[in-house]
Amino acid sequence: MAQSDPPKSPDPPLPTSIRNPQTPESGWDRIRELFQPNEQGHYPEEVGSIVKSAVTGALLGGIYGGLPAARHSKERYIQQSQAQIYQHRVEAVRSAHNAALRGFIRYGWRWGWRVAAFVTIFNSVSTGLTVYRDKLALSHYAAAGAVTGGLFRLNLGLVGLLSGSLIGAALGVPAGALISGLQSISGESIREKKRRERQELYENKVQEWSARLQVTDEVLEEMETSQQDPLEQQVEKIQELLQLPRNPAVSPKEGR
């Protein structure tokens, strides 16, 4: 009877540090994944884009509200200080510049934090819906615009809430179309890019893990070979000694 081949040992399991490249199936698991840094300590790209858009919105809002306010404050100060006497022309110019700076800071701050809050809420809601449903749709931006517009008009009561939601939803659709168009020009969306990067990272880690296992097996084989060599040499020496001819026996008479 032919001997059957010994069963192959199963492949060793991958370490826990090598995560599954597939995105989590649950929407809430994908949401929780947004707040978990990777091995390098970096947060997902979606969180980074929200922070960057908030900073950009604050800067643009500050410039949009601060520059006209600075010009208006300077002109108003000059008109109100026509009868004021200054010791030197430099003092008058400095006072006008200080008035412009105060106006820029005051109204720039007002516009800056409001635009930053608007952009942050809009991007947070749209990104959350996209991650939860794991797909990109214009309805996400419409819903984000409705939520943002309603919150900003909440102080006006129910009528303000409804009107703000309608206006926000209407403005969210073209904004979403613009964002989707920019992502299509780049070739892939953030979700597609994230899937590709997860798959590439997984493949690289598996290759590295396989290479480490191969090196470990080679080292173990060398150790076993080095341990077997001395034993084989000793066995050969014993066999050589056993094959040597025996010495002739010495009789008692010859010994005398």
Curated annotation (Swiss-Prot):
This is Complex I assembly factor TIMMDC1, mitochondrial. Associates with the intermediate 315 kDa subcomplex of incompletely assembled complex I. One of its GO terms (biological process) is mitochondrial respiratory chain complex I assembly. InterPro entries: TIMMDC1. It is found in: Mitochondrion membrane. The lineage of its organism: Eukaryota, Metazoa, Chordata, Craniata, Vertebrata. One of its GO terms (cellular component) is mitochondrion. It is a multi-pass membrane protein. Chaperone protein involved in the assembly of the mitochondrial NADH:ubiquinone oxidoreductase complex (complex I). Participates in constructing the membrane arm of complex I.
